[in-house]
């Protein structure tokens, strides 16, 4: 286990400001829908002793890391090993939440320590399942069995990758000779067909994003959860959602726009973005957007 994989909590100052603006500060329920390693939770629980945490995390490996990381707050925490959409659709608590946090980014542990193939920085098995028991198909199965047209649609629809046709064709041609098994193998296939002049990020970045989203059914879980997140807010409760790419951000934006102004209020018209200083300290935060809604 890599104990150095903990990352910085994104947009923490903005999140703390939301908590400080809650009208009542006594015996409040804070639900972290995407607990991960517990970095947001630790910072929040240290600062606000009037909060009790309900932490939801599907990956049992990372949930155990969170338990260890948050052990000094054990009496204030209830853990659920579940997908957040399952939790909220079948809401098990007898009280509404005062603050719900959703961080849709993948934990740095998954990139650096899980060995599940989320990153192409190391040569790992091409899996990408956050939970192997509930995710039916791995990334390796997708790239080795899906048709060229299905791969092209998947990559484009879930990442806006403009070279999805070239990439899908290259994948299908490569697997005629050899099964694609590792992250470096897939990265190499993609890099060879990507126009060099167009490279601003690693050529494999968007394809890996698309595969991860598809394998874990991320967009469907987000869409399913949104109405239940707002339904399970207490009066004056806050729902704060951090997104990291334009597809999920658009889903959140459109849902917030659909809510009745008589029942809910946006905290800010535009998403809250990380400061220049935060991006300097924590480069992965550069694509983060925080959208917030309050229940009236």
Curated annotation (Swiss-Prot):
Enzyme class: transferase
UniProt entry tagged with the keyword Transferase: yes
Annotated GO biological process: rRNA base methylation
Name of the protein in its database record: Ribosomal RNA small subunit methyltransferase H
Location relative to the cell: Cytoplasm
Gene Ontology cellular component annotations, sorted alphabetically: cytoplasm
Family statement: Belongs to the methyltransferase superfamily. RsmH family.
Keywords annotated in UniProt: Cytoplasm, Methyltransferase, rRNA processing, S-adenosyl-L-methionine, Transferase
Any coiled-coil regions, as ranges: none
Molecular function, one GO term: rRNA (cytosine-N4-)-methyltransferase activity
InterPro entries documented for this protein: RsmH, SAM-dep_MeTrfase_MraW_recog, SAM-dependent_MTases_sf
Catalytic activity field: cytidine(1402) in 16S rRNA + S-adenosyl-L-methionine = N(4)-methylcytidine(1402) in 16S rRNA + S-adenosyl-L-homocysteine + H(+)
Task of the protein: Specifically methylates the N4 position of cytidine in position 1402 (C1402) of 16S rRNA.
Annotated SUPFAM superfamilies: Putative methyltransferase TM0872, insert domain, S-adenosyl-L-methionine-dependent methyltransferases
EC number: 2.1.1.199
């Amino acid at each position: 286990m890599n104990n150095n994989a903990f990352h910085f909590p994104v947009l923490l100052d903005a999140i703390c400001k939301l908590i400080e603006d809650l009208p009542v500060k006594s015996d409040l329920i804070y639900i972290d829908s995407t607990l991960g390693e517990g970095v947001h939770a630790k910072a929040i629980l240290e600062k606000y002793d009037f909060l009790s945490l309900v932490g939801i995390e599907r990956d049992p490996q990372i949930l155990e890391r969170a338990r260890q990381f948050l052990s000094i707050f054990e009496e204030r925490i209830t853990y659920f090993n579940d997908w957040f959409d399952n939790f909220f659709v079948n809401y098990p608590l007898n009280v509404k939440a005062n603050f719900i946090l959703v961080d849709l980014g993948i934990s740095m542990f998954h990139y650096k320590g899980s060995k599940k193939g989320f990153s192409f920085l190391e040569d790992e098995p091409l899996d990408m399942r956050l939970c192997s028991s509930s995710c039916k198909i791995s990334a390796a199965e997708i790239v080795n069995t899906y048709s060229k047209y299905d791969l092209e649609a998947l990559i484009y629809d879930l990442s806006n990758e403009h070279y999805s046709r070239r990439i899908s064709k290259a994948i299908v041609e490569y697997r005629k000779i050899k099964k694609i098994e590792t992250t470096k193998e897939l990265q190499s296939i993609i890099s060879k067909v990507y126009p060099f002049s167009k490279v601003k990020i690693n050529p494999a970045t968007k394809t890996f994003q698309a595969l991860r989203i598809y394998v874990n059914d991320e967009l469907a879980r987000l869409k399913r959860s949104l109405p239940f997140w707002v339904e399970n807010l207490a009066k004056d409760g806050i729902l704060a959602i951090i997104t990291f790419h334009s597809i999920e951000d658009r889903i959140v934006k459109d849902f917030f726009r659909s809510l009745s102004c008589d029942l809910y209020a946006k905290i800010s018209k535009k998403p809250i973005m990380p400061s220049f200083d935060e991006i300097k300290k924590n480069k992965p935060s550069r694509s983060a957007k925080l959208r917030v809604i309050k229940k009236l």
